[in-house]
């Protein structure tokens, strides 16, 4: 195997314009980077601020678009010919690899933003030749323009590909608005070589030079049957969507490969049945490409010359296309009908015995023993080939749990087809959030548990008079205002802008698993929920004849809003915190406990929860949480400052509560974190906790965490803190805190015009 090599240039750009030269990150690579809070700003978007993609998609002639996609499937182009005269396999792979980057731990990845167009994804080894798939789609994208995003089009093309080959899909929803730059928030791994996994596994593999396959001829790693993949990653190698098709680190071991498959597919939200359905269903079509050694393949799109116009992986082997194509290095066509739906994949998997062999490109693959050549050639109708499989295909036979499912699918083809249609739909829509976001004539109406269903509003909503009366009742309970603020934040701040999961709607804060999370399993939550449930019952009983009701989800948010208003009033400022009813309460039966467990925060710096790890400091966790909440740096700053003085630390500690009047919405946090009369010293070796003392007397004044002191230490955050800590900053602080609070409370209110990201005002 060639020496491992970094996939990017080892030398910095010598350009002395356009941002070239030595940068801050070169001097201080560990410095906190706020860049992910500034992504996808209006300045990068070519459309007007009032452009409504949902309205544009709904104006689309959807079935005309599908007709054009159907025609494209068999319109083979000389510059990139279609295997078997049909592009279906290519477009299925494109859609799969667009959506399949999703992972459950942070909701990042997935097909929701069309990120496959940008580096690094457009240049991953696993995405070789998908640059051509997108160019084949360009005439259709050009024709329909802004009415169909790339994000939607790439996935719809995969759906139409299945239909064009005789498979009945479960449905399709549009609504994925494009972004216009690479998403820099995603941790794809720490490796610096393609196919490397020496960071994500403690005893991983160093990777390969350029484009290529790992050598399976080297001794297998001792831990491929036991190793644990680093969180939040799902893929087993840098540059792969899923697992190595040759087996773990190139070792052709189907049983060990099954372990990697279960980890990877599980981390994208798929159970064993869905995993088997996706692999067996997807591999019922098309082929892989390994006509010759990967040494013939040139650099990826991001490294290719200007004259290549965004295309990469130029192939020097003969024609470099069609029968001479090289992508994975594996040369496998799974069935004798690669352009028609069948259950032949499962039939062959169990009918034949398999022996290890090599592809023309030198990759490990498996060939059927003692049988005749029945597999058609993709370009020469006079040729036939022996049936072949990937190591990861054989995992479905040799892993006991997968085998049981696969044999059931083999015996019940209708059940297999239904399972594949549902798993494929889930794959494409996992990061779209609730079904209320679905648009288009083929969007299914069935509620599915992984969509986190919430009942539709079935009662008259409270009006302004009701809201005012409920606020008074809430504040008259005698509970501390911080209880209501903490509960509302705990409920709403589960939202993730990445996959549109979580949020206050549904009131799942009262259900398992959220109620038992360490960050929530505190006395204040039980006290608050008990009080609010009584208020809800009393109100609903009193107004039952009017048809009005208030959900607990609404009441939790309203209580937080009432407490913030009262805290501002006690600080000398009158302000109304917006509140819009319309949330509903989900049931425990509508809540998939295992799935929701992935939303539990490792850290929530807004509540001073969590500690630094050996690799991640508390302030990095804070910025990551802010990104999941779609917050800007000013919004993060004002929220931390406000939540501290409102005394909302998860455990009731006084760390960072830099005020002599907790519970009042003052700008004291900022004035005190910026106070030069305070000297700070680490209390626990500089890990997380600090003590602030009077610089003259040495008397203790405050304690604070890294998530607090970063607002005085980090130059950019200090600049923001100075705005709110100035003598004229109090009024702006309250106004901005209420705006950011309102945004977080409504992040999951997809029924409101301008909800979520669009509500950002700072």
UniProtKB/Swiss-Prot annotation:
EC number: 1.11.1.21
Catalytic residue positions: 97 (proton acceptor)
Protein source organism: Aspergillus niger (strain ATCC MYA-4892 / CBS 513.88 / FGSC A1513)
Annotated segments matching region Disordered: 1-22
InterPro entries in the cross-refs: Catalase_peroxidase, Haem_peroxidase, Haem_peroxidase_sf, Peroxidases_AS, Peroxidases_heam-ligand_BS
Keywords: Cytoplasm, Heme, Hydrogen peroxide, Iron, Metal-binding, Oxidoreductase, Peroxidase
CDD domains reported for this sequence: catalase_peroxidase_1 (cd00649), catalase_peroxidase_2 (cd08200)
Subunit (UniProt): Homodimer or homotetramer.
Domain of life: Eukaryota
UniProt key word Iron: yes
Pfam families (alphabetical): peroxidase (PF00141)
Protein's job: Bifunctional enzyme with both catalase and broad-spectrum peroxidase activity.
Gene: katG
Listed name of the protein: Catalase-peroxidase
């Amino acid at each position: 195997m060639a020496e491992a090599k970094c996939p990017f240039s080892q030398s910095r750009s010598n350009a002395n314009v356009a941002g070239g030269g030595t940068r801050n990150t070169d001097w201080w690579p560990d410095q906190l980077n706020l860049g992910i809070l500034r992504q996808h700003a209006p300045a990068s978007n070519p459309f007007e601020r009032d452009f409504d993609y949902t309205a544009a998609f709904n104006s689309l002639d959807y079935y005309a678009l599908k007709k054009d996609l159907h025609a494209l499937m068999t319109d083979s182009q000389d510059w990139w010919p279609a295997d078997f005269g049909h592009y279906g396999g290519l477009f299925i792979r494109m859609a799969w690899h667009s959506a399949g980057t999703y992972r459950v731990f942070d909701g990042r990845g997935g097909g929701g933003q069309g990120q496959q167009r940008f580096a690094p994804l457009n240049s991953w080894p696993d995405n070789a030749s998908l640059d051509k798939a997108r160019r084949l789609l360009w005439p259709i994208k050009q024709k329909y323009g802004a009415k169909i995003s790339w994000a939607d089009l790439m996935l719809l093309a995969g759906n139409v590909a299945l239909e064009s080959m005789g498979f009945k899909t479960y449905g399709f929803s549009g609504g994925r608005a494009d972004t216009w730059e690479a998403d820099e928030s995603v941790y794809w791994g720490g490796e610096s070589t393609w196919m490397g996994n020496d960071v994500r596994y403690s005893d991983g593999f160093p990777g390969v030079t350029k484009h290529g396959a790992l050598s399976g001829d080297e001794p297998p790693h001792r831990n491929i049957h036991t190793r644990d993949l680093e969180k939040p990653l799902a893929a087993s190698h840098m540059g792969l969507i899923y697992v190595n098709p040759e087996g773990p680190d190139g070792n052709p071991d189907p049983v060990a490969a099954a372990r990697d498959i279960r980890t990877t597919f599980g981390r994208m939200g798929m159970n064993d049945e869905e995993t088997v359905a996706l692999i067996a269903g997807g591999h019922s079509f098309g082929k892989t490409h390994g006509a010759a050694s990967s040494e013939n393949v040139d650099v990826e799109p991001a490294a290719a010359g200007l004259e290549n116009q965004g295309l990469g992986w130029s192939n020097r082997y003969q024609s470099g296309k069609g029968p001479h194509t090289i992508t994975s290095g594996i040369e496998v066509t799974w069935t004798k009908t690669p352009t028609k739906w069948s259950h032949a994949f499962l039939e062959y998997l169990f009918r034949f015995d398999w022996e290890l062999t090599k592809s023309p490109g030198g990759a490990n693959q498996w060939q059927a023993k003692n049988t005749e050549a029945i597999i058609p050639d993709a370009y020469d109708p006079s040729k036939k080939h022996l049936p072949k499989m990937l190591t990861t295909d054989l995992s479905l036979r040799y892993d006991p749990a997968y085998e049981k499912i696969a044999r059931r699918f083999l015996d019940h083809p209708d059940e297999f087809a239904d399972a594949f249609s549902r798993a494929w739909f889930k794959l494409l829509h996992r990061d779209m959030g609730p079904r209320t976001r679905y648009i288009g004539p083929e969007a299914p109406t069935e509620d599915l548990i992984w969509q986190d269903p919430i009942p539709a509003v079935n009662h008259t909503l409270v009006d302004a008079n009701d809201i005012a009366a409920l606020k008074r009742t809430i504040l008259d309970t005698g509970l501390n205002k911080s209880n209501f603020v903490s509960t509302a934040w705990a409920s709403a701040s589960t939202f993730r802008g990445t996959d549109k999961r979580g949020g206050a709607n549904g009131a799942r804060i009262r259900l398992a698993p959220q109620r038992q999370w360490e960050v929530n399993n505190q006395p204040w939550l039980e006290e608050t929920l008990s009080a609010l449930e009584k208020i809800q019952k009393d109100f609903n009983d009193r107004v039952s004849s009017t048809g009005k009701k208030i959900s607990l989800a609404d009441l939790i948010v309203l209580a937080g809003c009432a407490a913030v208003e009262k805290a501002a009033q006690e600080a000398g400022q009158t302000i109304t915190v917006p509140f819009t009813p319309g949330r509903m309460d989900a049931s425990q039966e509508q809540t998939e406990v295992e799935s929701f467990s992935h939303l539990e925060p490792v850290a929530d710096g807004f509540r001073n929860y969590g500690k630094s790890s050996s690799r991640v400091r508390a302030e990095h966790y804070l910025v990551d949480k802010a990104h999941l909440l779609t917050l800007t740096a000013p919004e993060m700053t004002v929220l931390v400052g406000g939540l501290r003085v409102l005394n909302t630390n998860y455990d009731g500690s006084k760390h960072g509560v830099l005020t002599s009047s907790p519970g009042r919405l003052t700008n004291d946090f900022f004035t005190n974190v910026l106070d030069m009369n305070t000297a700070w010293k680490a209390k626990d070796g500089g890990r997380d906790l600090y003590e602030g003392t009077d610089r003259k007397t040495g008397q203790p004044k405050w304690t604070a965490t890294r998530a607090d002191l970063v607002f005085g230490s980090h130059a950019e955050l200090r600049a923001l803190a100075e705005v709110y800590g100035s003598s004229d900053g109090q009024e702006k602080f309250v106004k901005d805190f209420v705006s950011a609070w309102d945004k977080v409370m409504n992040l999951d209110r997809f029924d409101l015009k301008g909800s979520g990201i669009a509500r950002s005002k700072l």
